[in-house]
């Protein structure tokens, strides 16, 4: 169809717009849009760009805090003051649909895109995390996806030179056709040295810098805004192709550019490419732009103007340059051998005007395109699923207690969701370019030193989607709380979060119920921990159609949190230090096995509520442990999560080749005591010399604590029964996942 061709409501529907949205576009323009204009609206009003089905609820999240230097959603990433004149810039985003079709490029470009969001703000990336979800690890498809995704992340990240310092990997059949690939990056910038994503200065030049533009990723935003089906393989051209070496050059050029104060605004070209960056920068600065599409460097012949507008070719950015500084900017990009081409100018009016060989092919008010502006806002139907009340009827008394707990323990430690992920993370470079403290001496959170400072950044990513499925509000509170717990256990102070909200189809009332419940839970927990939401993204339509059946994934609101370690001498690790140290649990134990790996994998029970959780209790437990760390009383700290107490004890033991001797609580079922996943529990170790001081500090009514046992030279003993040696369990733990994926 010709760029200037007239359109109809049928054309709009083919591009993914609703009939009423087409009517609104005609109303905004005061005329019928041409084909180019309709394409622009189709991507900017897609779910991926407009958040039209989520923005109403996202606005309810807490976004303010004294440490916040940028309002959520107004810049390329979140920005938080970390003291000493420095700020941490961080964000998490999804690349789920592209990774489902082309796992290597889908994951690689996800890594590239999230890092561009960081350095486009003038911050140098220092570390990456990722959160990955796959189907049954025994299936051929899952093995193909794992191999491609991990290679994509490692190839791009290792080549780009930014370490991957942590993350999480889960397997569940609900992700069989629709994996989740969520990528996080964090960087450091001087306070006041950040670059805005807003255009300003009438008459200032608009440049495109980076790679040339091709057809890869055209309509990628629209592709990410619909269900994955058996026909989705036809959408592979919507998957972008990345070049980490070009991105490295772009990073260094941008760092140099940030020093000369010649840039008035800069934005990464991600979803919807030039269309999105020009519209968001213009709307953000309340200005317009004239853009000459024939000036854009292309790498494929015969590209139509609308293809150039919608291309999602990677490693590109839009830069607004201060008038008179054009040569300074050009010299920097020439030095790094990177395309730097003037393609437009900032104008006074609110209009975005696009030209092709001096002919105007589109004219649109910028504000009408963007979320929070003229883009649609919907509130979808909500319906509580039947399973929700059914899950709450779960009765632990109907679950038989196993006669051989050791046999169960061996199975638990080798489960794909429990066992070591070294098969995956050993493919990542965890040390390049930074001082990562977590490689040799792990903490619950990843700890990255700040050059020239005694401070460090703690960062973590967490979400147990089975908990969220069982109870969206409680499950999401747990996700936020576990992030905070991990940072506290590492010696840090939680600061702020970013989120990646992965859900099914928002037009499904039960899915929308899950989504709204998750927002409520996130809001409550973030307010309690004083961790404002800096931004993130929403990824709907994560589900799979096989024949006539559509199954949404478990709701997966992935939370990434950063915290500040004010003194690296206070960093606390998880491994046992010395034989004879005493093992204490801070927080109460309940007779609870709900939604645990034990219940699902040993008893085959999928229907149960979220684990027992109380937000105030959680907060009190964390404050207690934080105080113990500050007073340098304890030797290690490790939170209890998947797999329960036994797995937590083993993880600390295996890192040090030490063992443990413990006694279970006779008032609680042994399986619940060892493998239950009730929340708000932290295992600490303390030397006998410090035990009295520990007890004195813990003798308050607000937080329960009890002696669990002591550290041994290597033997594992439970209730005076010999369970073998730590090396046996470590062999199971280290090799189980690799043996499955290599079959």
Predicted stretch roles:
Residues 16, 244, 616-619:
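Alpha-helix N-cap/helix-start motif at coil-to-helix transitions, marked by capping-box chemistry
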Residues 2-15, 19-21, 27-38, 177-179, ...:
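Glycine-/charge-enriched secondary-structure boundary and capping motifs
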Residues 42-46, 59, 271, 334, ...:
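Short amphipathic alpha-helical surface patches that mediate protein-protein
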Residues 2-5, 75-338, 342-356, 370-379, ...:
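Mobile "lid/hinge" segments at catalytic clefts and subdomain interfaces of large enzymes
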Residues 20, 249-252, 620:
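Generic alpha-helical secondary structure signal
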Residues 4-81, 86:
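N-terminal amphipathic, basic-rich helices that act as targeting or association modules
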Residues 30, 261, 419-422:
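Generic alpha-helical structural signal
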Residues 49, 60-109, 113-115, 119, ...:
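Non-catalytic terminal/interface segments that mediate subunit docking, oligomerization
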């Amino acid at each position: 169809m010709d760029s200037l061709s007239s359109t109809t409501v049928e054309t709009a529907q083919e591009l993914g717009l609703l009939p009423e949205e087409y009517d609104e576009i005609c109303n905004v323009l005061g005329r019928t849009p041409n084909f180019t204009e309709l394409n622009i609206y189709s991507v900017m009003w897609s779910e991926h760009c407009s958040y039209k089905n989520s923005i109403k609820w996202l606005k309810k999240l807490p976004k303010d805090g004294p440490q916040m230097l940028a309002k959520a959603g107004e810049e390329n990433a979140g920005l938080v003051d970390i003291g000493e004149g420095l700020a941490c810039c961080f964000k998490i985003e999804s690349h789920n649909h592209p990774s489902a079709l082309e796992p290597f490029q889908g994951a690689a470009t996800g890594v590239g895109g999230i890092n561009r969001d960081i350095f486009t703000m003038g911050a140098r990336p220092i570390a990456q995390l990722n959160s990955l979800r796959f189907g049954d690890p025994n299936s051929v498809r899952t093995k193909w996806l794992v191999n491609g995704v991990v290679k994509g992340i490692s190839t791009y990240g290792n080549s780009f030179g930014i370490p991957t310092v942590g993350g999480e990997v889960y397997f569940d059949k609900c992700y069989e056709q629709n994996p989740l690939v969520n990528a996080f990056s964090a960087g450091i910038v001087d306070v006041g040295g950040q670059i805005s994503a807003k255009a300003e200065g009438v008459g200032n030049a608009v440049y495109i810098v980076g790679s040339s533009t091709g057809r890869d990723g055209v309509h990628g935003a629209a592709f990410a805004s619909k269900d994955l089906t058996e026909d989705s393989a036809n959408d592979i051209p919507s998957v972008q192709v990345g070049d980490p070496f070009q991105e490295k050059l772009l990073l260094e050029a941008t760092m140099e550019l940030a020093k000369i104060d010649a840039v008035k605004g800069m934005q990464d070209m991600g979803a919807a490419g030039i269309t999105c960056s020009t519209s968001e920068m213009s709307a953000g600065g309340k200005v317009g732009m004239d853009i000459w599409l024939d000036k854009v460097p292309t790498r494929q012949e015969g590209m139509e103007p609308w293809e150039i507008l919608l291309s999602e070719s990677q490693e590109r950015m839009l830069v607004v340059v201060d008038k008179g500084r054009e040569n300074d900017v050009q010299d920097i990009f020439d030095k790094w051998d990177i395309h730097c081409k003037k393609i437009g100018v900032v104008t006074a009016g609110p209009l975005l005007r696009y030209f092709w060989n001096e002919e105007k092919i589109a004219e649109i008010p910028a504000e009408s395109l963007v979320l929070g502006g003229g883009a649609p806002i919907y509130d979808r139907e909500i319906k509580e699923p039947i399973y929700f009340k059914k899950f709450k009827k779960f009765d632990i008394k109907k679950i038989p207690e196993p006669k051989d707990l050791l046999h169960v323990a061996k199975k638990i430690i080798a489960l794909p969701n429990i066992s070591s992920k070294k098969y995956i993370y050993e493919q990542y470079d965890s040390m390049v370019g930074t001082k990562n403290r977590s490689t040799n001496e792990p903490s619950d959170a990843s700890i990255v030193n700040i050059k020239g400072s005694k401070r460090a950044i703690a960062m973590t990513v967490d979400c147990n989607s089975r908990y969220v499925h069982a109870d969206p509000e409680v499950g999401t509170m747990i996700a936020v709380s576990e992030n905070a717990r991990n940072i506290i256990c590492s010696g840090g102070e939680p600061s702020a979060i970013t989120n990646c909200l992965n859900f099914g189809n928002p037009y499904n009332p039960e899915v929308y119920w899950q989504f709204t419940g998750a927002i409520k839970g996130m809001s409550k927990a973030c307010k309690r921990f004083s961790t404002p939401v800096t931004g993130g993204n929403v990824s709907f339509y994560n589900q799979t159609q096989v024949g006539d059946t559509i199954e949404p994934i478990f709701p997966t609101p992935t939370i990434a949190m950063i915290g500040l370690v004010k003194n690296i001498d206070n960093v606390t690790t998880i491994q046992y230090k010395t034989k004879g140290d005493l093992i204490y649990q801070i927080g109460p134990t309940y007779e609870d096995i709900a939604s645990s790996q034990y219940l699902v994998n040993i008893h085959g029970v999928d229907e149960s509520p979220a684990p027992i959780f109380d937000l105030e209790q959680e907060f009190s437990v964390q404050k207690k442990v934080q105080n113990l760390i500050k007073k340098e009383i304890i030797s290690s700290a490790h939170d209890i999560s998947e797999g329960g107490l036994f797995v937590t004890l083993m993880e600390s033991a295996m890192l040090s080749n030490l063992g443990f001797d413990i006694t279970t609580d006779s008032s609680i079922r042994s399986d619940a005591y060892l493998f239950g996943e009730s929340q708000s529990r932290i295992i600490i170790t303390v030397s006998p010399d410090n035990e009295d001081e520990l007890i004195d500090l813990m003798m308050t009514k607000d937080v329960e604590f009890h002696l669990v046992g002591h550290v041994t030279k290597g033997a594992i003993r439970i209730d005076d029964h010999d369970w073998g040696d730590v090396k046996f369990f470590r062999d199971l733990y280290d090799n189980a996942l690799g043996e499955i994926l290599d079959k």
